[in-house]
Amino acid sequence: MGVVTRLLVGTFLASLALPAQGGVLKKVIRHKRQTGVNVTLPEESQPVVFNHVYNIKLPVGSQCSVDLESASGDKDLAAPSEPSESVQEHTVDGENQIVFTHRINIPRRACGCAAAPDVKELLSRLEELENLVSSLREQCTSGAGCCLQPAEGRLDTRPFCSGRGNFSTEGCGCVCEPGWKGPNCSEPECPSNCHLRGQCVDGQCVCNEGFTGEDCSQLACPSDCNDQGKCVNGVCVCFEGYSGVDCSRETCPVPCSEEHGRCVDGRCVCQEGFAGEDCNEPLCLHNCHGRGRCVENECVCDEGFTGEDCGELICPKDCFDRGRCINGTCYCDEGFEGEDCGRLACPHGCRGRGRCEEGQCVCDEGFAGADCSERRCPSDCHNRGRCLDGRCECDDGFEGEDCGELRCPGGCSGHGRCVNGQCVCDEGRTGEDCSQLRCPNDCHGRGRCVQGRCECEHGFQGYDCSEMSCPHDCHQHGRCVNGMCVCDDGYTGEDCRELRCPGDCSQRGRCVDGRCVCEHGFAGPDCADLACPSDCHGRGRCVNGQCVCHEGFTGKDCGQRRCPGDCHGQGRCVDGQCVCHEGFTGLDCGQRSCPNDCSNWGQCVSGRCICNEGYSGEDCSQVSPPKDLIVTEVTEETVNLAWDNEMRVTEYLIVYTPTHEDGLEMQFRVPGDQTSTTIRELEPGVEYFIRVFAILENKKSIPVSARVATYLPTPEGLKFKSIKETSVEVEWDPLDIAFETWEIIFRNMNKEDEGEITKSLRRPETTYRQTGLAPGQEYEISLHIVKNNTRGPGLKRVTTTRLDAPSQIEAKDVTDTTALITWFKPLAEIDGIELTYGIKDVPGDRTTIDLTHEENQYSIGNLKPDTEYEVSLISRRADMSSNPAKETFTTGLDAPRNLRRISQTDNSITLEWRNGKAAADTYRIKYAPISGGDHAEVEVPRSPQTTTKATLTGLRPGTEYGIGVSAVKGDKESDPATINAATDLDPPKDFRVSELKESSLTLLWRTPLAKFDRYRLNYGLPSGQPVEVQLPRNATSYILRGLEPGQEYTILLTAEKGRHKSKPARVKASTAGEPEIGNLSVSDITPESFSLSWTATEGAFETFTIEIIDSNRFLETMEYNISGAERTAHISGLRPGNDFIVYLSGLAPGIQTKPISATATTEAEPEVDNLLVSDATPDGFRLSWTADEGVFDSFVLKIRDTKKQSEPLEITLLASERTRDITGLREATEYEIELYGISSGKRSQPVSAIATTAMGSPKEITFSDITENSATVSWMVPTAQVESFRITYVPITGGAPSVVTVDGTKTQTRLLRLLPGVEYLVSVIAVKGFEESEPVSGTLTTALDGPSGLVTANITDSEALAMWQPAIAPVDHYVISYTGDRVPEITRTVSGNTVEYALTNLEPATEYTLRIFAEKGPQKSSTITTKFTTDLDSPRDLTATEVQSETALLTWRPPRASVTGYLLVYESVDGTLKEVVVGPETTSYSLSGLSPSTHYTARIQALNGPLRSKMSQTVFTTIGLLYPFPRDCSQAMLNGDTTSGLYTIYVNNDKAQKLEVFCDMTSDSGGWIVFLRRKNGREDFYRNWKAYAAGFGDLKEEFWLGLDALSKITAQGQYELRVDLRDHGETAYAVYDRFSVGDARTRYKLKVEGYSGTAGDSMAYHNGRSFSTFDKDTDSAITNCALSYKGAFWYKNCHRVNLMGRYGDNSHSQGVNWFHWKGHEYSIQFAEMKLRPSNFRNLEGRRKRA
């Protein structure tokens, strides 16, 4: 036995055997073959490939099992690194390759079952197989080579070399894959032998210490850098924030001071006495007493404390800066009070007459004024009068002590009493002032009161109109009750005018003059009786409206004669004779008759027909119909019928008609002995009305019928074009049947309650995109076709929409190193979110964080300042991920560091800080007092050094400031670095000596601006001993006592706060004696003056100061400085009758004495008072006044205008006068009036007043510029200047007035928004303040307005409609005129009520100008104009002639207007549209390329530049073809095409599915579609799957039509296959009755049956096989047939037909083979495969018959 034979035996045994060393497997192990070879082995110099598959089934009786999931399962079954499925591939062109692989896996034994007979049989087979393999191995290692002898058969041996290498015939051993070694490639091998730096364990390197990597080639870093750095060549490069050899130490963010601290775990540990981030900050004094924080070695105190060490109390609210704070207590400034000086103090303490609230006095009852010093009037006179010394002087209309009572008009005329200003009139009186007589009960509001008597309104009467009157006073036939007549008996009606009928005619008639006219059917005087019809004709009596007839008469009115026996109820009685009903006869219709005498097809028995066989019905006239018609089966194109019939029938007529409109009725007949049939060639999805008639002796029965609809087909080829988050786009294959719409349904399989989304699509749509879906949801998509409101079966597919990414990503709370990223969760259900961030445009620098699905924010840290970052978020679920959603943000600027104070003065502070990391432009310093106040800010440039300095100036002394420094760059600003710093205290101000004595000095000074605690006073004694005195902060003076006289002293005064001191204020002074003054006296007192005298030390004083103070504080203080030598003074210019206090003090060098005082009262003088102005006119007014009687000799009155533009007027009046009328003044002028009395030549104090003369009216009103809606009004202004003019205008006929106000300098204005054609009354009034002049008036009439909004509409070539908005004013008529180029003007007049006018007889394509204006009497409005162009008129008489199947001739007559061309449009019923533009001279056009049997619509339009005429239209139908769109070559041939060549066919007769094919019209009657031709070898047929699906080659030479085309063509119906073969003059053919190719889902499965011919049935071997190419192997052989034979076909194992093989290659199975004609070793010269419909001959015969 040869080697190959042994191999074949081994393969057979291996297919049955199962390794049993470790037990028996429970499940079937199957490995799919991937590649292989054919059974014939080559010569010894050629390559060989062995590749085998085991199909091993366990015996049914085995009860053993192996737990493949446990540790002793799979791990023991597979080799150490065996993949889950063994896949062996070899290259396409590996011609010198040998592969022989044999492998058996033996699992461990799972249970003891070796004694089972079937297991023993397997073990024996396995032993035999191992023997064969061993002998084979011995032969292959003997040096004689391997597998040298050719052999045939099937190889089913398992691959050798453990599936990890290839068997080599040269070395007769395994060539292992990388990573494996050993004779059977079963030992793992480590990469690069671990570079001798480690051990190889199970194929993986276990590296020695110090090395790492897959092959131990890399140096390892200490502790792997603790995941805090990168390892580079064995050295750790630490990440930011870490240091050390192994990156284990955290570095401090700010380097620690080397002198004051050290870095421990990333934080500075400071030495005692220092603090801060870098230990550079010294601690504060007393640790701020625990009442503040230490900043820059100074305490920033908590609220309520202050001082250097926060040891001092702060006053409440810092006394609001309204007082001084001494140890927590406020000493308030004048005008303020309260614990915190927060309350305003009231003037003079409200003089004890009220209480102080918020700085204002709330006075006690009876007092008023800012300080409650004034007496108050009762109830403040109710604001209706003036309060004079506690008494009310009431305004006009008010009276009473407090002006609280209203004064009544006319004193109620003496006929009533006054109550609250209104008259309560006496009985019988009314009116505002009770002056009118009153009517009884005020006429009840139903009449007018005239001189105390009521004049009643219509419908009322009585002395007080309280009674209702009746109409016509009831005509004296009734009485009037509450305005309604109650009629006497016998009368009725609203006014009792009508006579009444008896019983009101019982509601059955009308009452006319007291008599009843009864309705039809009623009688009697009161219409109460029923009347009989025609009064029973006198042949009966009337009883209750019904006639009781006499014998021999009948009827409702007894008008008919009676028939015998009443015709037995079987006939009609006509004039006493019976007219019998059908079926009855005789005088009384008592006998029965048969209908139609049984039509001679039966016998009449007792009135019933006994019908002959086959007939039925009452008269035997009907053929017995079939019964129980049922539909037994329905398909897309057929309906099976069955029925019953027991009667004799000649034949049956089957008639079927579509139920839709215009359905064509069709019929056929079947023999009478047949009770079933099949209706064929029906249209799918159409409802048919089917009737079956029985035919007997050429007579039809009534039909039995049924309605049935043929089934709709299922759509095909539904696939997904695109799948997105919220949309899915699908496409599918078209169908060749007629139907209405596609219906596509989307259903969410995750949320059934959401319902379905249904969309209907029109043909020929084959794609659809559904939006609005939910992300990450599983959807079922079903596709149906709909026809006649019926939905066909659906094609379903399932898909899942993509996950949506998180949305609305936002970076919040962004600082210089952190950012909070927030987002909206995705709509889809997800497992988690992947967040990635890094510096933008730096791709490698990215950090990724995995988050849970519930999170919607994440805080990012350790960012760089002022850096743009990019964040992306991706949703993940299992292996699905969304598109990334991205957002960018920029970190903020970092704050300055180590901010500190360098120095300060009392008004400045100098700062220094370290610059931040970000490159800031400037630094912004904001500062404000900690105690409160406005903040200020400055900006300083950034220093190029590491630190920046700045000085704040203009500060308040001794004030602690809160200071913040932030970095600024553009519009960005960092967080501030903050510090508190205080300015120095300022020294006391104006330090001086105010009083010198021999042993004392009085010191004065002003308080410093700063807040401080105390003063320290220092001076030295003449002995040199220093003296120090501490003074309270509220001190502003101090007396030094115990001094030595005549000594000079230097005195220093310092303000202090805590340990802080101001610079000292300095003064020098000497002690001396003090002069004196005294004996101040008053003499020579007059009303306006008095004299003073006093004594004083001679020569001691430089000056004296005299102060005169009004004791009531009403007058200003008067101060006089006189020489120190004077001892008297005369004081004049005083107010008479006033109390004065006089103060006198002396001023000596360096000393001011204490003042001495005295009192004095000036004498009173006579008064003139109460000067009043009244009765102002334009040229004057009246004056009145009061004066003491008998005191004055005369009065002097002075009058002058306040602007002093005229000479003053002075009038001397008699002593007795108290009033004077002043005239001759200017109008509207303000005058000053002064009046004083003359007594004994002396003037009294004058009284004064201000008076204004009244305004004059405007004059001479005129009008100009009058339009339809506006006019200009002018006037002459009055003499006096006024503030404004008010112009009022209103239509004369009435309406709302309009008002315009203009400036007082204007003399005219424009009145707008007037109504056209209306007369207006216009008034002008001058206004000044609240004063108005008398009006000046005039009238004007506005112009007539014209129509507006002129437009044209409904424009045709000869007509147009003019429309306009009417004039606002009523007009008599409108005048219309229109003209065009070369068209004379036409004028028409229409009524003023018209708003449109039809323009006719226009010229086409002509521009017209249209004008219109309104007329009213002599008035004409303005004219409005518009232009329009008439349409181009259409071509005429468009007709289609010479119509053929593909051509037609269109002719027409030109329009009247000139044209530049014609647009010709013709459209078929399927919507195909074509347009042609022809020249202006053309009047006919020949159409070509039309489709046969097609209805066309042709339209033509004339063109003239931009103008287009209306379309003229005609329709025509081309001459028909049998098949306008042939679906294959047979239909093309039936259309009359008989020449072989290229043709266009239409799949499913669908014009949209064109396909070019080669038709063979000669072979076997023609009609063949050729889909394969081999003739010369020019075309390469060794192609991939894609090429064979699409097709390739030249249709006139060698080609392959394509699998897609074949599938669609054969899906149209049943086709037959013909194969024509030729070789050197020999021919053969093969014909198969049934041939089809499946779709791509079946991999184009072949179905071929019904052989006949001369070539032999070689195709039967390939029936049911899918198509194979070298890149898509579907054959059943152990090899890749397409790869082996360099072709493609429906291979099995492998072929009997290989028409796509190598042309001219006679090698075994390599050439163009047809096995049953030339065998496998001969390549045929010519071969064609072609197809046509199986019923072609029937179709051809039908065509010939037609």
From Swiss-Prot:
Domain Fibronectin type-III, chain residue ranges per copy: 625-717, 718-801, 805-894, 895-988, 989-1075, 1076-1166, 1167-1256, 1257-1346, 1347-1433, 1434-1522
Tissue expression summary: Submaxillary glands and brain.
The region called Involved in hexamer formation is annotated at 23-185
Please give the residue positions where the record annotates the modification Phosphoserine.
S65, S70, S72
Which positions fall inside the EGF-like domain? 174-186, 187-217, 218-249, 250-280, 281-311, 312-342, 343-373, 374-404, 405-435, 436-466, 467-497, 498-528, 529-559, 560-589, 590-620
Where in the sequence is the signal peptide annotated? 1-22
Q: Which residues form a coiled coil?
A: 118-145
Q: Which Pfam families match?
A: EGF_TEN, EGF_Teneurin, Fibrinogen_C, fn3
Ranges where the Fibrinogen C-terminal domain occurs:
1520-1735
All disulfide bonds of the chain are: C190-C200, C194-C205, C207-C216, C221-C231, C225-C236, C238-C247, C252-C263, C256-C268, C270-C279, C284-C294, C288-C299, C301-C310, C315-C325, C319-C330, C332-C341, C346-C356, C350-C361, C363-C372, C377-C387, C381-C392, C394-C403, C408-C418, C412-C423, C425-C434, C439-C449, C443-C454, C456-C465, C470-C480, C474-C485, C487-C496, C501-C511, C505-C516, C518-C527, C532-C542, C536-C547, C549-C558, C563-C573, C567-C578, C580-C589, C594-C604, C598-C609, C611-C620
Modified sites of kind Phosphothreonine: T905
Q: List glycan-bearing residues.
A: N38, S72, N166, N184, N327, N788, N1034, N1079, N1121, N1354
Q: Which GO terms describe its molecular function?
A: integrin binding
GO process annotations (BP) = cell adhesion; regulation of cell adhesion
Q: Does the keyword Chloroplast apply?
A: no
Family as reported in the entry's similarity comment: Belongs to the tenascin family.
Known function: Extracellular matrix protein implicated in guidance of migrating neurons as well as axons during development, synaptic plasticity as well as neuronal regeneration. Promotes neurite outgrowth from cortical neurons grown on a monolayer of astrocytes. Ligand for integrins alpha-8/beta-1, alpha-9/beta-1, alpha-V/beta-3 and alpha-V/beta-6. In tumors, stimulates angiogenesis by elongation, migration and sprouting of endothelial cells.
Q: How does it assemble?
A: Homohexamer; disulfide-linked. A homotrimer may be formed in the triple coiled-coil region and may be stabilized by disulfide rings at both ends. Two of such half-hexabrachions may be disulfide linked within the central globule. Interacts with CSPG4. Interacts (via the 3rd fibronectin type-III domain) with integrin ITGA9:ITGB1.
For this entry, the protein name equals Tenascin
- Organism equals Sus scrofa (Pig)
